[in-house]
Amino acid sequence: MKYDQWKMTRRIEEDFLKSLNFLSTLFEKIAIISGNDVKAFQNKMQTFQNSVPYDNYINDIVKRMVTPLAARNYETWRKAARVSTRSHFLYTVLMEELKQGIKKDIDSQIISNAALIKTLPSDTAQKVVRDIEEYALSGLRVEEIEKLIQDKTRQHSRASARLIARTEVSKTTSALTKARSEELGLRWYVWRTMEDGDRVRKSHRIMNDVLVSWNNPPSPELLVKEKDVGRYHAGNIWNCRCYSEPLIDIDDVKWPHKVYINGSIQKMSKARFSLLI
């Protein structure tokens, strides 16, 4: 059974991007007041990164991203469990276990996401400085340095904001689903793509509708003979909107079904798969 509500909502990603772009605007203002002084720009960005208001802001925007994701994830679990679970008793137990794990999961994701965003000012500054050093070899006038600092700050900060918003919303969703699956003893999920046509990577397209064990993340790139970028679960790599659909009941999928096992995708019967769970 394919339950579409596991699919990630774009609204949370868009709201998170707006919050990150506000930081980009502040970085651009720091670049303007720094003029052509690269060292002053670096120092100001580092000072901003170490400030209490910055800490408060990133914790706030991360909380506003993680909390609705966790709420949606819980609601999706509740509905999927009701559809998949034939026993009312089992459904009740499932819901109780989910409730107990929610706060811990939310707190964990807030901490990890805030840590990632924390270094955004210094990371942006370092990229700008590297660009300035490269351009300096060709000889730059003072006014060109000033404009370059501003342009590169905008370019790098906006690009980072887009990457973080897309990647971290997806990774947070994946982490929440994985944590709750493990709490409930559910070891398998179905890898789903967002079905964006040509926008889906070839390596991810081959993983669509494949059963994957949480204990054995695949290396999709190796399956299509591309450069290996490591082993990871659905939605757990940069610029990926794939998502995991937990296998709550073995009859939630049609058999025989594709299964990732021993580094390859195999068509497997229900009886054979039953030996793995």
Q: Where would I find each of the regions flagged by the language model?
A:
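N-terminal leader/targeting and assembly helices and adjacent pre-domain segments
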Residues: 1-156, 247-277
